[in-house]
Each structure stands twice: as structure tokens, then as C-alpha cells.
Amino acid sequence: MAQEVSEYLSQNPRVAAWVEALRCDGETDKHWRHRRDFLLRNAGDLAPAGGAASASTDEAADAESGTRNRQLQQLISFSMAWANHVFLGCRYPQKVMDKILSMAEGIKVTDAPTYTTRDELVAKVKKRGISSSNEGVEEPSKKRVIEGKNSSAVEQDHAKTSAKTERASAQQENSSTCIGSAIKSESGNSARSSGISSQNSSTSDGDRSVSSQSSSSVSSQVTTAGSGKASEAEAPDKHGSASFVSLLKSSVNSHMTQSTDSRQQSGSPKKSALEGSSASASQSSSEIEVPLLGSSGSSEVELPLLSSKPSSETASSGLTSKTSSEASVSSSVAKNSSSSGTSLLTPKSSSSTNTSLLTSKSTSQVAASLLASKSSSQTSGSLVSKSTSLASVSQLASKSSSQTSTSQLPSKSTSQSSESSVKFSCKLTNEDVKQKQPFFNRLYKTVAWKLVAVGGFSPNVNHGELLNAAIEALKATLDVFFVPLKELADLPQNKSSQESIVCELRCKSVYLGTGCGKSKENAKAVASREALKLFLKKKVVVKICKRKYRGSEIEDLVLLDEESRPVNLPPALKHPQELL
């Protein structure tokens, strides 16, 4: 065939000159020989005539020069496409391929190279079978991607710092709520003590010092109890409260009997009686109220003590009855706030009893003692009206303060749990899948061409470098995370695997694969190999799947092939929503 073409060109020098002008610069003799054959077979009327050209033919050629030039350029393009397909393995749209193959019929190319297409490569891999991930850990090649390591290390540092700032902000919120509740309780106590001090203008200097000391001790105890136990406030059970009331009953009875005996036997002046009664009252109050304020459910214990309605009823009943000493003891055991009212509003009460009861720490007791100091010039009926009105006022104030304290305390205890649950509350939707899928469709094509360039998927290929290069070609980054195997609670552990490292690969917040090895490079190589196996299928799909993370199941975006089902996925090394 080549001899026939050379003989034809030697006989027609004009055709030979015309064809030689169509040769490209740098085109090899082998390529040009076959492409010249293609041009001559399909030139037709485009080639000049073999003999001497006449004037008439030249004029006709000039008239049709525009059409001839277009046809000539099309013929040259077809010849170049055919040569690229034969010698370089290029492929074109189906219409173009059919056209150039039909034009090249009869041309025999004996020394053309052979190329493997992507579809043929995938078919070969399927026939050969894909090795499982449970095989021995293979040694990676010497090439390492330094940029990937640096970027993953920087991202891990950013994740750690963000977690620390979130914890610090949560602690600041808890401390601020504790301080706010303590300030509210102190303001309530100060308001009550200021109202009492306005009525207590006629009392002695000793009584004022005792009342100021009691109010300051109450505020300090409230602040310590609020700040120490605010986050762990729990309601005490009924059995514990019953045993506590029995202890109070015994302590109050003992102190009341001692005080009555001392008043009967002592003939000392009023000043010594005042000092003794104040000391005994301070001891009884410290024994009664310190455990109440130190308990975890302080707000719920104070609620029945300060704002209970039976306090006013027992106070009014104590006025009408003359057996007031026994009734005052029993009522003070049931409700601490009513003890002073029943004992102070009784007729013929001594001044020592009034001053001793001034040292109690509840506001209703102090108000009742002030009423008792004024009872010398008033009747028992007027005392009943004043005591009931003051008791109702103290009940309203105590109710408002106790309600605010009880509403604050459970909110503090649940603040940490609500923050931890809201922290990762956003759920993945199909919109997230639709946003990620186009990128991985492009990545599938890029990885396929990279595999064709290196001769297909094989153990000799640096899988990590190939995957990273394909992702960087699409202007994205490969996220790499490392965790020691012993820190994973969702994997079985034995002595041989204690020192292993687990690697997880992600891209665009989508999970690609997990690998385990004795070093970070080894683990990354295994994870990259598992990720590349997905791209050997016909199609890759982004799906929302369940994965384990620290003992619980979470949702994650996972890259899978079209046929596989998400069963027994490896546990997540980090929470996916931390990385979004």
C-alpha cells in the first residue's frame, strides 16, 4: 500500500506538493505516512489535477475557493482526530468516531500501540476480585504528602481550641447564674431586715447588735449554700425530712426546759438574764439552721418554713389559748416560723423571753418579737390583727423569694445537660446530600483518569498520594484524623493492638474510609486504599448512615458505591458536626 502511494505521488508532482504542505510541524514519519494516506483517500476534488492546469480550471478554482477551504479544513481535522485515536488512544463523541472510522476503512496500521480504557480496566478488576480490608497491613511507598499532614494537624489544633472555649463559656454561665441567685437571696434578706429595723426603733442597743449579727450570718450562709449546691439541687425525700423534724423537736424541747428552769431559779438582774437567754438561743439556732442551709435542697426546705400558711393560724390560736408554752414548742417543731409568734403573743410573757427570741433567724420570728415588745400598751385583740397582717406580708415576701429561688435552681442543674444536647442538635437532611453529590461525581471521574494514568489499581500504587492529588485537582482538601486504638471504646482491644493508630479520611465533611496501622503513615495508606476501592465501582453515592461514636449512634454523611449497603461501618473518631 505504501508503495502504491509513493508511485502515485511520483507520477503527480502537483498532488505530492499539495499533500506535503498539509504536514504538521514535528509530526513523525510514521504518523505522517498514515495520515497522508487518509488525506489522499478522502481528498476527492480537493486535490489538484494531475496534468498541467488550464486557465479555465484556475478561474473555476478561484470561484469555489471559499467552499474548498472549508472542506479542506474539515478533512484535515478528521485526519488529525483519526491519527490521535490510533496512535494516542484519544476518544471523541460517537458521531465523530463513526465518521473517522468510516473514512479510514482500508487503511492498515500494523505498528499502532494498544490502550486500556476505563471501562475495560473496571471490568478486569471485577474479574480479578477486590482484596478485603482484613488482609495484612501493607507497607506504604516512600513518598509522603507533607502538606496533608500539616493541614490535618492544624485542623486538629483548631478543633481542640474550640472545644476548650466552649467548656470555658459553659463554666462562666454556670458561675454567673449561681452568683445571681446568691445576690437575689441576699437582697431579699436585706429588704426584710431593713423593714424590721424600721419598726425596732424602741429596742435596746443589745437587741440591735444581736439582730444585725443574725441577719449577716443568714446572708453568708445563704450565699455559701447557693454557690456550693446550686448546680446539684435535689428535693429531699420525705423520710429524711421526718427524721430531721424529730431531731429539731428534741433539741427545741431541751433548750426550752433549760431556759424556763433558769428563769424560775435565777434572781439576778435583767441584764444577766438577757445575756444567758441570748447565748442559749444562739446555740439552738445554730444547731437548727446550719444543716438546713447546708443541705442540697435548701430552697425546698425553706419553702415550708417561711411561706407556709399554718404559721399565721398557729399564731392566732396561740393568742386565744392560755396553754401557750406547750403549744409553742409543738408548733415550732412543725413550722419553725410560728414558734416565736405563739410564745411571744401569749399574755403575761416576760421580757427575757422576748429578747431571747429576737435572735432567731427567720423574718417572721423577728416581726413577732417586735409585736411582743409593743404588747404592754395594747390588747390581745389588736395584737392578733397586727400579727396576722405581718404574717401575711412575710408570707408573701417569702413566697416570692422562694419561688424565684426554686425556679432558678432547676434551671442551673439542667443548664449543662441542655447545652450538651443542643450542642449537636442539627440533623442531616437530603439537602446536605444534594449539595455534596456533584463534587463526588467530579471526583469519581478525576480518580478514574488518575488510575488509568498509573496503569490501574494495584498494591504498587501510592494510594494516599493518588487520592490527595485527585482531590487537590478539584480545589478541595483531604481531611486526615488520627486516634490511638486504645482510646476507641467501640472496638475490641487486645495486647497486640494497644500501640496501633487509627486513621479516618474525610472530604467536604463526608466520610471516605478508615485504616489501622502501627504508624500514622501506615494507617493513612490503608485508609486511602479503602477509599479508592469505592471509585472502582460504576458510581459513588453520598448517603446519611448511622455510625457509632463513644458508645452511641450518630448520623454521618458517608460515601458508598451504588450497590453496597452501610453495614458495620467503623466508629467515628470525631463527631461529624464538630467538623462542619
Swiss-Prot record:
InterPro entries: dsRBD_dom (IPR014720), XTBD (IPR021859). Residues 155-167, 231-240 have a biased composition (Basic and acidic residues). It is found in: Nucleus, Nucleoplasm. Ubiquitously expressed. Induction: Up-regulated during replicative senescence, in response to DNA-damaging drugs, telomere unprotection and oncogenic Ras-induced stress. Induced by proteasomal inhibitor MG132. Up-regulated at G1 and G2 stages of cell cycle. The modification N-acetylalanine is found at A2. There is a cross-link at K184 (Glycyl lysine isopeptide (Lys-Gly) (interchain with G-Cter in SUMO1)). It comes from the Eukaryota. GO terms for cellular component: granular component; nucleolus; nucleoplasm. Residues 168-179, 248-269 have a biased composition (Polar residues). Residues 129-356 are annotated as: Disordered. Keywords: Acetylation, Isopeptide bond, Nucleus, Phosphoprotein, RNA-binding, Ubl conjugation. Its main location: nucleus. Residues 185-228, 274-313, 321-356 have a biased composition (Low complexity). The modification Phosphoserine is found at S131, S241, S389. GO terms for biological process: DNA damage response; negative regulation of cell growth; positive regulation of cell growth; positive regulation of signal transduction; regulation of protein stability. The modification Phosphothreonine is found at T346. Regulates DNA damage response in a dose-dependent manner through a number of signaling pathways involved in cell proliferation, apoptosis and senescence. Belongs to the CARF family. This is CDKN2A-interacting protein.
